[in-house]
């Protein structure tokens, strides 16, 4: 399953030579009109495991879909990685559990990932991230003691 904004698809032909392929485009110029979830539903596709990469809003939707369908889901996160070894914490994402390295609810995308089981990480919207930063909290605890 591949999703694109429009007909400017890439790798579709190459990937299609290895497996059956469904395509969704937001404008409907190729394949199903809409998101990858629209195509999955329209074509009645099923899976035991989902592997996803792409923009955060899409990953949030895939994560929610997988949880509702009881499907194991792995997501690949894209973050800027300053040091690449986990020391600077510049690539952290919010996580469900406390990280042993930093003692906060973060995962280091460069060191712990970039691929995570979907329910291990929180996929915050830009607004949610902004609210946490303005509140002075990047650890996910929002100043609350456990």
Label each PLM-derived region with a short phrase.
Residues 9-12, 18, 40-47, 105, ...:
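Iron-sulfur (Fe-S) cluster-binding modules
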Residues 14, 65, 95-97, 121-124:
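Amphipathic, positively biased hydrophobic alpha-helical segments used for protein targeting
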Residues 10, 61, 91-93, 120:
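Residue-level recognition of conserved structural "scaffold" positions that shape functional pockets
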Residues 37-41, 87-95, 124:
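Short, surface-exposed amphipathic charged segments that create phosphate/polyanion-binding patches used
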Residues 1-82:
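FNR/FR-type flavoprotein reductase catalytic core
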Residues 56, 79-115, 138-145:
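Local cysteine-cluster metal-coordination motifs and their immediate loop/turn environment
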């Amino acid at each position: 399953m591949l999703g694109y904004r429009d007909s400017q698809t890439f790798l579709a032909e190459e990937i299609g030579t290895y497996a059956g392929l469904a395509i969704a485009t937001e404008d409907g110029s190729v394949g199903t009109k809409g998101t990858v979830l629209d195509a999955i539903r329209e074509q009645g596709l099923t899976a035991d495991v989902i592997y996803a990469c792409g923009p955060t809003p899409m990953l949030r939707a895939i994560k929610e879909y997988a949880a509702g369908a009881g499907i194991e889901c792995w997501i690949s996160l894209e973050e800027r990685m300053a040091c690449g070894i986990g020391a600077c914490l510049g690539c952290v994402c919010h996580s469900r559990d406390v990280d042993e390295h930093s003692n906060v609810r973060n995962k280091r995308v460069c060191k712990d990932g970039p691929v995570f089981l979907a329910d291990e990480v929180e996929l915050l919207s830009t607004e949610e991230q902004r609210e946490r930063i303005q509140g002075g909290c990047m650890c996910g605890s929002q100043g609350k003691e456990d």
